[in-house]
Amino acid sequence: MSSAGLDRRTRRRQETIEEILTAAIELMEAEGVASLSLSAVARQLGMQPPSLYQYFPSKMAIYDALFQRGAEFFREARLEANAAADTDDIRELDIIAVTAFSRWCMENPVYSQLLFWRTVPGFEPSPEAFAPAQETLEDLRQHLQAGVDQGHLRPEAATEEGLALYTSITSGLVSQQLANEPHASFEDGRFVRLLPTALDMFYQYYAPSRGKKT
């Protein structure tokens, strides 16, 4: 087979994978994340279940692909927001990134449940699928280290403990928002509006001691 023929087959296969993942998202939006089934996805696409197995051998494989795609989208949203920011101030960049994060989560609740909640019994993302999430954590660690280097934070802020606290207070508020007011806008959200206050608390907790050189 010519390279052009192989390219067409590869492209068509990727298009079918995207169609499957899109159908899975639509079904989970309507019926719940944990209720996904391969037969329902096949019906949605007008396929026979055996044909679907050529692309995904199990529904856990679909969850895995969606976890990876969601983690990639989530990271892109944060990076693009910071890249477009007209400031170098660490705390302002924090607000911008957290705003982008929370908006993305509210606009993509299915991905958010896969990434941040244990909604699917028995599902664990593969190392490949989890890699973009680890890259996002490394982005955050570097950001917090920049805050340390600029004298805004103590060194402990950029440790595993600091990362755990930061992600807990930010993702925790977004989780509360999605659980209690899933249809609210970002501007009207009772919990996400507390994100700037939560970040202030983080910076106050890890603030350098007065009079101490950093």
Feature annotation, model-predicted:
Residues 113, 126-130, 148-198, 210-214:
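Hydrophobic/aromatic-rich alpha-helical bundle segments in the mid-to-C-terminal region
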Residues 1-15, 82, 210-214:
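N-terminal intrinsically disordered/low-complexity leader segments
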Residues 103-142, 161, 184, 188:
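Short secondary-structure transition hinges
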Residues 19, 27-61, 65:
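Helix-turn-helix
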Residues 20-28, 36, 70, 101, ...:
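Short hydrophobic clusters on alpha-helical segments that form packing/core surfaces
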Residues 13-24, 41, 66-70, 74, ...:
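Generic hydrophobic, amphipathic alpha-helix propensity
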Residues 68-94, 125, 146:
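Amphipathic alpha-helical linker/stalk segments
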Residues 79-110, 159, 163-166:
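Hydrophobic alpha-helical connector segments
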